[in-house]
Amino acid sequence: MAAKIRRNDEVIVLVGKDKGKKGKVTKVLETGKVIVEGINLVKKHQKPVPALGQQGGIVEKEAAIDASNIAIYNEATGKADRIGFRFEEGKKVRFFKSNGETIK
């Protein structure tokens, strides 16, 4: 099955503490989760690793969020949108369901 959400897609969070925030997908995990830039920030207590020259402390980083809790953001409508697939010139492409516009 083709991935509806891909890396570098502009998405909007539908539920949770970051509801309504927009960000760019940095990584799509095989477990059905995605990592979005600036969304779902958590504080990790990092141990120092002198061999690598890493300092210890509290580091803020992005945690994975389930793909069902985000939707692709349609710039034309300014809203969250659904994705469909169709064939154009022998290639499978993604499109916005609301206005039929091809994604990228």
Curated annotation (Swiss-Prot):
GO MF entries: rRNA binding; structural constituent of ribosome
The UniProt entry's GO biological process terms, in alphabetical order, are: translation
Matching entries from Pfam families are given as: KOW, ribosomal_L24
Which UniProt keywords are given for this protein, alphabetically ordered? Ribonucleoprotein, Ribosomal protein, RNA-binding, rRNA-binding
Q: Which domain of life is it from?
A: Bacteria
Keyword DNA-binding in the entry? The reply is: no
The residues the entry assigns to the signal sequence are none
An annotated GO cellular component of this protein is: ribosome
Instruction: Describe the function of this protein.
Output: One of two assembly initiator proteins, it binds directly to the 5'-end of the 23S rRNA, where it nucleates assembly of the 50S subunit.
Q: How does it assemble?
A: Part of the 50S ribosomal subunit.
The Swiss-Prot or TrEMBL record describes its family as follows: Belongs to the universal ribosomal protein uL24 family.
Question: Any idea what this protein is called?
Answer: Large ribosomal subunit protein uL24
What organism is listed for this UniProt entry? Aliivibrio fischeri (strain ATCC 700601 / ES114) (Vibrio fischeri)
Question: Which gene produces this protein?
Answer: rplX
